[in-house]
Amino acid sequence: MPIRIDNDLPAKAALEEENVFVMDKERACTQDIRPLKIAILNLMPNKLDTELHLLRSLSNTPLHLDITFLQTESYVPTHVSESHMEKFYNYFSEIKDKRFDGLIITGAPVELKEFEEVDYWDEVVEIMEWSKTHVTSTLYICWAAQAGLYYHYGIKKHILNKKISGVYEHHPLHNKLPIIRGFDDKFYVPHSRNTGVDGEAIRKNKELTIVAESDETGPYIILNSTGSQVFVTGHPEYDVMSLHYEYVRDVKRGLNPDIPKNYYKDDDPTKKPVKSWRCHANAMYYNWLNYYVYQVTPYDLEKDK
C-alpha cells in the first residue's frame, strides 16, 4: 500500500530502506484516485518511533493512505524537537472541521493516573466525541483503548498487581467477524501495561463484543456494534526492540522489572528478541483498514456536512 507522507518525515527513509512503498505528496497529487484520509493522534513519548511503527503496520494493503499526524495543544511533548512537531503535526483545532476515513489514537504513559487527572484528558475527550460524527472508524490502542471504553461506555480500568510485559498467546472468539480474518487459532501480541479492563463489564454491554482475548492478559480486541470503534489493548504495531528498550529503561530506573515474557531467546535479555507477532499485526491492520474503513466509508467525505 502506498502511504502518502511529507517528503522530509524522518520515518520515510527507514520505510524505504525496508522496501515499504512510500509516495511523496507530489506523486500522490498526480494520481486520479481518492486516498483514505487517516488521522493519527500520537500520544506516545517517542514520536518518531511510533510514527515508524504505525506507518510500517499500515503499509500492507493496496490502499492509498493520506496520513495526518495530530498533537495535543494542552500538553507539550518533551521527547521530540519543537521543529519536528511544527513541521509534521497538526493541532486538533486545525482539522476539526474536516472528516476522516480513519483515526488512530495511540497509547500513552499515563495509565496509573485517573483519566480525569491526565493533562490532556479534556482534549482527548473532545477528539473522541468528534470522532463519532467525523470519522468512519476509530482504532484505539492500549491506554487509548481503556480511555475509549471508559468515555464511551463507562467501563473502568483497574491497576494490576504486576505489570504485564511480554508477548502473549491469544485466540479469536468470533470467527465470522472481518477484523479477525486470517488470524491463526493461536497468535501472539506484545503487551506493556500496568492496568487492565473488566472483561465481564464488557460482556454485559450489548454494544460491545470481545472478538479476541488472552488467558493471561484478558480482552484484546473489542468492537462496538457498528465497527466504528475498535479497541485494541495490546501493541501489535511494536517494533522487535520496543519491549527491550522499555525493559532497559525500567532497569535503569531501579524498578526491578520482570523479564518480558516470551520475548528474548531463552528468556535471556542479553540475546536478541524474537519477533513472533509480525503476521498477526499485518492481518489486524489490514482488516481494520479494508473492512472497517475502506469498504464502508463514503467516497465523498464532505457530502453530509
Name what the model sees in each region:
Residues 1-74, 88-95, 99, 126, ...:
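Amide-donor transfer/coupling interface in amidating biosynthetic enzymes
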Residues 79-80:
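Acidic/histidine-rich helix-loop elements
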Residues 105-174:
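Cysteine-nucleophile active-site neighborhood
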